[in-house]
Design a protein with these regions (language model features):
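Active-site and adjacent substrate-binding regions of carbohydrate-active enzymes
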Residues: 1-191
């Protein structure tokens, strides 16, 4: 209920396959993305049973499951993080040494520089089999927690971040294009 601590809430199962079968029958071309935070295995089962794309969020899947993008299925959309999560730089800066070492092992690197690790995370996501890959601009820019969009359950500074003129520059554009081409997500003809 409004005003209550969100941690006291509970998840209630919805109608499941019956609903999506009815929606698919009425709107056969409708594209639906299932929000899958990785915490409830039945969500992935529902997406699979209904041939729906679901999402994989690197921060969530690594934090809770130890799963990395190379294990993501092809019929999904991958994200480095969502509006409700920290930026990649913020996430990496808060990460314990043990967790960071585990991430580095998964990325097959000894790299310590946080910005370089951000770029490796982005490259790993882009190289995944996922049909689509969404990287928030804050992650491309290596911005820390101050550029976080939303901190659930808080008031005040949420939804305030804006990219400033000049933050997007030629070097970043080239980096994005090169990563997109190398991962097969953009052809050189589109550059």
């Amino acid at each position: 209920p409004y005003g209550e601590d969100v941690s006291l809430g509970q998840r209630i199962a919805g109608p499941g396959t019956e609903l999506f079968s009815a929606v698919r029958a009425a709107f056969p071309d409708l594209k639906i993305i299932v929000e899958n935070d990785g915490l409830h295995p039945d969500v992935a089962l529902l997406a699979s049973a209904c041939a729906l794309s679901d999402m994989r969020v690197m921060q969530t899947s690594f934090d809770y499951c130890g799963s990395m993008p190379d294990a993501y299925p092809d019929r999904c959309i991958c994200y480095s993080g969502t509006h409700d999560q920290d930026t990649l730089t913020g996430w990496l800066n808060r990460m314990s040494r043990v967790r960071k070492d585990a991430l580095k092992a998964c990325l097959n690197t000894e790299e310590e520089d946080v910005w370089a690790l951000c770029d490796l995370c982005i490259r790993t996501l882009m190289d995944s089999a996922c049909t689509d890959c969404i990287i928030p601009m804050q992650d491309w820019l290596h911005l820390d927690s101050h550029a976080r969009i939303n901190a659930p359950g808080t008031l005040g500074e949420n939804w305030m971040w804006r990219m400033h003129e000049g933050q997007f520059h030629d070097q970043l554009e080239r980096q994005m294009a090169q990563m997109s081409m190398a991962s097969g997500r953009q052809s050189s003809e589109n550059m």
